[in-house]
A protein has these predicted regions:
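A compositional/biophysical signature of low hydrophobicity enriched in polar/charged and small residues
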Residues: 1-79
Length: 79
């Protein structure tokens, strides 16, 4: 069963646009939004397994230039 998570991302000053463009293209990213509030970008990420989801977040998302912090919220129920 696929797993999904919302990843809330804070970027460095003046890096939001570039980070957003890079993140939106990553495999597994289903939706990407720039937002107001304490975070700058929110992603919906899907993967086949929890392990694969972790790899996407740790290796790909956190590797994008300009990201200063992430918070991941794994979904437990979808309706």
């Amino acid at each position: 069963m696929p797993v999904s998570a919302y990843v809330l991302i804070r970027t460095e000053a003046d890096k939001t646009k570039g980070a957003f463009e890079s993140l939106a293209k990553l495999k597994g990213v289903k939706t990407a939004h720039t937002v107001t509030g304490p975070f700058d970008i929110i992603l919906l990420v899907e993967a086949k397994t929890l392990h694969e989801l972790g790899d996407v977040i740790l290796s790909k998302i956190r590797g994008v230039e300009g990201i200063s912090r992430t918070m991941t919220c794994v979904t437990v129920e979808t309706g």
